Regions:
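Intrinsically disordered, charged low-complexity linkers and terminal tails
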Residues: 13-14, 30
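Hydrophobic alpha-helical segments, chiefly the membrane-spanning helices
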Residues: 34-411
């Protein structure tokens, strides 16, 4: 007899007392639902598996990479480069799924918590990949170059392109200018303490200043976080007018706030995605290092790859927000990601340096310092009046193009 027949018999029999019959039916339905034996449960499970096929694909990809690692090395640099590119693409796609579920959580809690969840998930990916690569690499400048690249990508790349495209479509786009000012001064302070002052610290005192930097970054971020979610939360939000909809037509004003699945499910998939990224990143870094060894590739290419992987989900989210005329979300994402990268990555990596006894070179080069100052000055001017436009976006995007040019020049 089938499951449906068994259920029908157990619930419709007249032999048992009514109270016992109701209780047994309730227990039966609960068990069948928890085991996914109902049509609704099967449909939901199938839908989740279909949506998260990229996460599932990462598991056999990691197994294949593990089993073929030595064969790829023996095949030469070209094979290693192809394997690294494939893994980078897969890591980016998984990062986008992580960002997707971060957006689901963000839609449930609203700003500023929403964009904070998104940027923290991106920073978690970046720190994890950095830690894995640093365990296999002897480059003392990788952390510095990655943070510098992330700031260039976030402010000049993401903010610049979003303001440019949004300005071309909507003209002037409003946002809360308090957020731009707050982010700007925090980024300047954090980068000054952690990436400019170290140039003047005696080598024998690096561990003392490293410990101070950790405390300073944590103190800055703790107060910033308290203000962002507390008394000054209005700094990071903007009240956009609701669009009117014709009678009889459903409102799609919150189409972007996807309500797919539960909060625990999204949290679980974010954690699973970050773990899978870490596993794939270990193989990716090995293959990429092997393929670039002895070539004329720019020294900072690995750092740019790490920064791009962590920023890739934010790029799509920011562009969608700009084209919807939601510039506040763009500012929170671009500037918030830059701040989070500096203020959270630095203490973690400095802590690793103190633990291992091997210092990193955190002081920026003169070219990097000049680019950061030009970027932050331009951001301070452009984000000072509560509206962005295409010209302001173009200035940042040209700075991003300059960053790419300097990368290929080895600067």
């Amino acid at each position: 007899m089938g499951q449906r027949g068994m259920s029908s018999m157990s619930c419709n029999t007249t032999i048992l007392p009514k109270a016992f019959k109701r209780k047994s039916c309730l227990i039966s339905r609960t068990i069948r639902h928890s085991l996914g034996l109902t049509g609704e449960g099967k449909s939901m499970a199938g839908s989740i598996l279909k949506q998260e096929r990229l996460l599932l694909l990462a598991i056999p990809a990691a197994i294949i990479a593990y089993m073929t690692e030595h064969a790829i090395f023996e095949a030469g640099k070209t094979a290693a480069l192809i394997a690294a590119i494939v893994l980078i693409g897969l890591i980016v796609l998984i990062s986008m799924r992580v960002a997707h579920h971060a957006e689901i959580l963000a839609a449930k809690v609203g700003d500023p918590y929403g964009t904070m969840i998104l940027t923290l998930s991106a920073v978690a990916v970046e720190v994890l990949i950095l830690a894995i690569i640093m365990s296999e690499s002897s480059s003392p400048t990788l952390v510095r170059d990655t943070i510098y690249s992330a700031v260039m990508i976030d402010i000049n790349g993401i903010l610049g392109l979003a303001a440019l495209l949004g300005g071309l479509r909507h003209g002037e786009q409003p946002y809360n200018d308090d957020s731009g000012k707050t982010y700007g001064v925090m980024i300047l302070t954090a980068m000054g303490i952690s990436m400019i002052v170290p140039e003047f610290i005696p080598e024998q005192s690096w561990h003392l200043y490293s410990a101070f930097t950790i405390v300073a970054m944590i103190a800055l971020y703790a107060l910033f976080l308290k203000m962002q979610v507390g008394p000054h939360s209005y700094f990071f939000s903007y009240a956009y007018p609701r669009k009117a909809h014709p009678a009889g037509q459903p409102s799609h004003g919150h189409a972007e706030e996807e309500d797919e699945g539960s909060v625990p499910l999204s949290i679980g998939l974010i954690i699973a995605g970050v773990v899978l990224i870490g596993v794939l990143a270990e193989f990716m870094s090995t293959f990429l290092s092997e393929s670039l060894e002895g070539t004329s590739a720019p020294p900072a290419l690995m750092a740019v790859v790490v920064a791009t992987i962590s920023a890739s989900p934010e790029i799509l989210t920011a562009l969608r927000s700009a084209l919807r005329n939601r510039m506040q979300a763009v500012v929170n994402i671009a500037m918030g990601a830059s701040l989070s990268t500096v203020i959270l990555t630095v203490p973690v990596m400095e802590g690793i340096a103190l633990y291992t006894g091997q210092p990193f070179i955190m002081a920026m080069t003169p070219v990097q310092t000049v680019m950061v100052f030009i970027t932050l000055i331009a951001a301070a001017i452009n984000l000072n009046d509560g509206e962005t436009n295409a010209i302001e976006g173009m200035t940042h995007f040209i700075l991003f193009a300059t960053f790419i040019m300097l990368l290929f020049l080895g600067l």
